[in-house]
Swiss-Prot record:
GO biological process: positive regulation of translation
Lineage, broadest ranks: Bacteria, Bacillati, Bacillota, Bacilli, Lactobacillales
Organism per entry: Limosilactobacillus reuteri (strain DSM 20016)
CDD domains: EF4_II, EF4_III, LepA, lepA_C
Protein name: Elongation factor 4
Residues in tr-type G domain copies: 11-193
InterPro entries in the record: EF-4 (IPR006297), EFG_III/V (IPR035647), EFG_V-like (IPR000640), EFTu-like_2 (IPR004161), LepA_C_sf (IPR038363), LepA_CTD (IPR013842), LepA_IV (IPR035654), P-loop_NTPase (IPR027417)
Record's keyword terms, sorted: Cell membrane, GTP-binding, Hydrolase, Membrane, Nucleotide-binding, Protein biosynthesis
Keyword Cytoplasm: no
Similarity comment: Belongs to the TRAFAC class translation factor GTPase superfamily. Classic translation factor GTPase family. LepA subfamily.
GO CC list: plasma membrane
SUPFAM superfamilies registered for this protein in UniProt: EF-G C-terminal domain-like, P-loop containing nucleoside triphosphate hydrolases
Length: 611
């Protein structure tokens, strides 16, 4: 392909993402677009075709961004190359959305006609505006009886500031109106403008590990071209490789002769060292490198930390290898080794939220055949010590002795809760109960309010989202961002089983709620931990002060069953022998703690009962 042909091809490229609040129909719209561009045969077509992880299909959510190249024959008679990137909708995966948008010129914003504009809809609009993208509003599910397309258009105008007349009414399920969306993409999304003759400059927006090909880089080529046999350089580490293959996903990988400025595709170069590749890095030519790298991505800060431990300590190295491979595919995951007296060796992992943590644990167990125990999640605390130094504490077990602590600061979030007027009362009540500070209330329309509170992150990760949904019958939507650290009256609560501290069950709580939480946790653990042949006391303590206690009763074997009822001496002797045996067993007996016990520190009673 000569330069003129490349320039002509570039004019026909359209790079766009589909973004929306969770459950508004992104993946269904992606399915229809694939169908209408004949990218996939009727035989291969299935729902959520781009959600290729079994976990995504089971949960019905998108977890990973997914890029696919399509050819669309437009009404003007020309063929256009669409690079479509499907993105997640859950707040935990907003990092995936921001990476997708950096590889695009346009964003199709899907809004559910039955739900209207929700918190994550707004968050995605701001991400798209940050990346200077053309936003195409689409109103989905207009075929449902409860759909209100006119009301939704008004929200799009009032709350987002987009022209409601530009919004396209569609039903992604039936395909109605989708052809109009495709035509708008051709007309309104600008073609990429990268210089084809400049040195290669490509942004790595995702990557994964393949056992046969090594690391597969997903790239958006910004300038120049790359083909098989070229020498490339990863600018972050300076490592050089020879390109083994370039291609596009359509949706299966298809090798191509060349990737040029504007293309979204993949590069393989027999990269075996996972540490060499980083999402956000710039790929350039080793022989003719570019002067300065692309801006890349801001480093994500984990919001939630938890310990991951293999049930078999011999699998520690397998867990490390698995985490390294997952980190390649999920740049927001962080981990470092740690050890626990109760659980042995494992890793302290950082996640963006509880769903992110759940998904990582499930992927590790499924994809890498590991059996894991996860400790209760916690946040990062800033501890000011009496000697003037500050320590960051991610693990409650590492909290310094209370006598050496001057102050403890905890992270707060600015929570934006969109809710119908009728439910403002229950929402404010919930926020107050969760130690929230009221900020402001914005009336978005006659029927909807945006309530803004500053709430400790530790309260958000506990059970806030479930309580919010139940107190508003599912109508509220939540978006939040970190809002700095504030001093709080916090204490570390230790859990003792049979008199021994279990470091992995320690947690941090506000002093005002410490006794209540201690009683809750000990009661939950009593339900979960199996009975033994000896009585097990469960205690919650702040330092040396016990604030709550309960006992798990011992199994009682009837040792007197075989003796004659009229022999009281023999009976007393056997009972005394049993008592002495249990006392000895209690002194040396180790209590087996099931996985559910570690999550009991987090879950509410209702959630435990459901299990």
């Amino acid at each position: 392909m000569n330069l003129e042909e490349m320039k002509e091809r570039q004019k026909h490229i359209r790079n766009f993402s589909i973004v929306a609040h969770i459950d508004h129909g992104k993946s269904t719209l992606a399915d229809r677009i694939l169908e209408m561009t004949d990218s996939i045969s009727k035989r291969e077509m299935k729902n959520q075709i781009l959600d290729d992880m079994p976990l995504e299909r089971e949960r019905g959510i998108t977890i990973k961004l997914n890029a696919v190249a399509l050819t669309y024959h437009a009404k003007d008679g020309e063929d256009y190359i669409f690079h479509l990137i499907d993105t997640p909708g859950h707040v935990d995966f907003s990092y995936e959305v921001s990476r997708s948008l950096a590889a695009c010129e346009g964003a199709v914003l899907v809004v559910d006609a039955t739900q209207g504009v929700e918190a994550q809809t707004l968050a995605n609009v701001f991400l798209a505006l940050d990346n200077d993208l053309e936003i195409l509003p689409v109103i989905n599910k207009i075929d449902l009886p409860s759909a209100d397309p006119e009301g939704t258009k008004k929200q799009i105008e009032d709350e987002i500031g987009l022209d409601p007349d530009e919004a396209v009414d569609i039903s992604a399920k039936t395909g109605m109106g989708v052809d109009e969306v495709l035509e708008k993409i051709v007309k309104d999304v600008p073609a990429p403008t990268g210089d084809l003759t400049a040195p290669l400059k490509a942004l790595i927006f995702d990557s994964k590990y393949d056992d046969y090909r090594g690391v597969v880089l997903s790239v958006r080529v910004v300038e120049g071209t790359v083909k098989k046999g070229d020498r490339i350089k990863l600018m972050n580490g300076g490592t050089e490789y020879e390109v083994a293959e370039v291609g596009i996903n359509s949706p299966k990988p298809l090798a191509r002769d060349v990737l040029m400025a504007g293309d979204v595709g993949y590069i393989t170069a027999a990269i075996k060292d996972i540490k060499d590749t980083r999402v956000g890095d710039t790929v350039t030519s080793a022989d003719n490198p570019t002067d300065k790298p692309l801006e890349g991505y801001r480093q994500m800060t984990p919001m939630v930390y938890a310990g991951l431990y293999p049930t078999d300590n011999a699998k520690f190295n397998d867990l490390r290898d698995a985490l390294e491979k997952l980190q390649l595919n999920d740049a927001a995951l962080t981990f470092e080794p740690e050890s626990s007296q109760a659980l042995g060796f494992g890793f302290r992992c950082g996640f963006l939220g509880l769903l992110h943590m759940d998904v990582i644990q499930e992927r590790l167990e499924r994809e890498f055949n590991l059996d894991l125990i996860t400790t209760a999640p916690s946040v990062t605390y800033h501890v000011e010590l009496a000697d003037g130094t500050t320590k960051e504490v991610e693990n409650p077990a590492e909290m310094p002795d209370a006598s050496s602590i001057k102050a403890i600061k905890e992270p707060y979030v600015r929570a934006s809760i969109m809710v119908p007027n009728d439910y403002v009362g229950p929402v404010m009540e919930l926020c107050q109960r969760k130690r929230g500070d009221f900020d402001t209330m914005e009336y978005l329309s006659d029927t909807r309010v945006n309530v803004i509170y500053h709430i400790p992150l530790s309260e958000i990760i506990f059970d806030f989202f479930d309580k919010l949904k139940s107190s508003t019958r599912g109508y509220a939507s939540l978006d939040y961002e970190i809002d700095g650290y504030r001093p709080s009256n916090l204490v570390k609560i230790d859990i003792l089983l049979n008199g021994d501290k279990v470091d992995a069950l320690s947690f941090i709580a506000h002093r005002d709620f410490a006794a209540e939480r201690g009683r809750e946790i000990t009661a939950k653990l009593k339900k979960i931990i199996p009975r033994q042949n000896f009585e097990i006391p469960i205690q919650a303590a702040i330092g040396s002060k016990i604030i709550a206690r309960t006992n798990i009763k011992a199994y009682r074997k009837d040792v007197t069953a075989r003796i004659h009822t009229g022999d009281p001496d023999r009976r007393a002797k056997l009972l005394d022998k049993q008592k002495r045996g249990k006392k000895r067993m209690k002194a040396v007996g180790k209590v087996d703690i099931p996985q559910a016990a570690f999550m009991a520190v987090l879950k509410t009673d209702e959630q435990l009962d459901e299990k």
